């Protein structure tokens, strides 16, 4: 999917990977970039607007843990303004295994709820035009960082739900793929808590491994958007982009 002249909603588009990805998206010339984030950052929005004055960048405060009905109201406002939306990026995430309920609420439930809300506007069974969803998951959805089992499990759940969305595309008209970054230098990984303090130095130890910059990740994210492959499981690690094959150990046959 060419980004040029498209209308894009980016949930958590002002975070570490999110903000660099927003920059790269704006450079590609969408018609509208709507950023939904919990904390307003006027300086960041101003930077995005200055980067490409031909792109309309707007911001709405949004907490992904609100009920689906509240999300639907916000999306109604956006659809009333833009008329059409081509791409939804779900990027909200926290890494802190002290906060068990919130980790699950943000990393998994919030992604599912935002997706459920936008289906009211996209689902072809309701006369919608369809759309594309890109969910930011994590390589920990493939293999856990065992010191942060809550975070890893939440990302595995988000990945699994994204794979299911892709399979449902013939029914809903909505395609989906996952973005799974490896260890990336962002504020998220500089300091975080392991579950029950099983490894107090987990953040420090993790950063001893090879990493990538958030810019490298963002540039490959844009390549994945442009590839627009329904069901793709993209691994963005060490500055590379790779579509991985999901190993099937069981099939429902339905």
Curated annotation (Swiss-Prot):
Task: List GO molecular-function terms, semicolon-separated.
Answer: alcohol dehydrogenase (NAD+) activity
Q: Which residues of this UniProt protein bind substrate?
A: 138
The record's Pfam families line, in alphabetical order, gives: adh_short
Positions of NAD(+) binding: 10-33
Known catalytic reactions: a primary alcohol + NAD(+) = an aldehyde + NADH + H(+); a secondary alcohol + NAD(+) = a ketone + NADH + H(+)
Q: One GO CC term of this entry?
A: cytoplasm
Q: What is its EC number?
A: 1.1.1.1
The first-level EC class reads oxidoreductase
> From what superkingdom does this record's organism come?
Eukaryota
| Active-site residues annotated for this sequence | 151
What Gene Ontology biological process does one annotation of this record name?
alcohol metabolic process
- The answer to keyword Oxidoreductase applying to this record is yes
Presence of keyword DNA damage? no
User: Which terms are listed as keywords in the entry?
Assistant: NAD, Oxidoreductase
Quaternary assembly: Homodimer.
Q: Please give the family membership noted in the entry.
A: Belongs to the short-chain dehydrogenases/reductases (SDR) family.
What protein name does the entry list? Alcohol dehydrogenase 1
Source organism per UniProt: Drosophila mulleri
As recorded in Swiss-Prot or TrEMBL, the protein's gene is named Adh1
């Amino acid at each position: 999917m060419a980004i040029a002249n498209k209308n894009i909603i980016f949930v958590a588009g002002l975070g570490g990977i999110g903000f660099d990805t927003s920059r790269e998206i704006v450079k590609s010339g969408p018609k509208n970039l709507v950023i939904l984030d919990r904390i307003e950052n006027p300086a960041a929005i101003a930077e995005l607007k200055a980067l490409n004055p031909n792109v309309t960048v707007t911001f709405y405060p949004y907490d992904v843990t609100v009920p689906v009905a509240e999300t639907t109201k916000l999306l109604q406002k956006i659809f009333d303004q833009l008329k059409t939306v081509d791409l939804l990026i779900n990027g909200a995430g926290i890494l802190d295994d002290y906060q068990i309920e919130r980790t699950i609420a943000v990393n998994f439930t919030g992604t599912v709820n935002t997706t459920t809300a936008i289906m009211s506007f996209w689902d072809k069974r309701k006369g919608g035009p369809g759309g594309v969803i890109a969910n930011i998951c994590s390589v920990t959805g493939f293999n856990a960082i065992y010191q942060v089992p809550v975070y890893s499990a939440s990302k595995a759940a988000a990945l699994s739900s994204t794979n299911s969305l892709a399979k449902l595309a013939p029914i809903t008209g909505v395609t989906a793929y996952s973005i799974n970054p490896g260890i990336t230098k962002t504020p998220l990984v500089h300091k975080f808590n392991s579950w029950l303090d099983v490894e107090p130095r987990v953040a420090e130890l993790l950063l001893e491994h090879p990493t990538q910059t958030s810019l490298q990740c963002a540039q490959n994210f844009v390549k994945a958007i442009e590839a627009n492959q329904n069901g793709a499981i993209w691994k963005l690690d060490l500055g590379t982009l790779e579509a991985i094959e999901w190993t099937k150990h069981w099939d429902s046959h339905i």
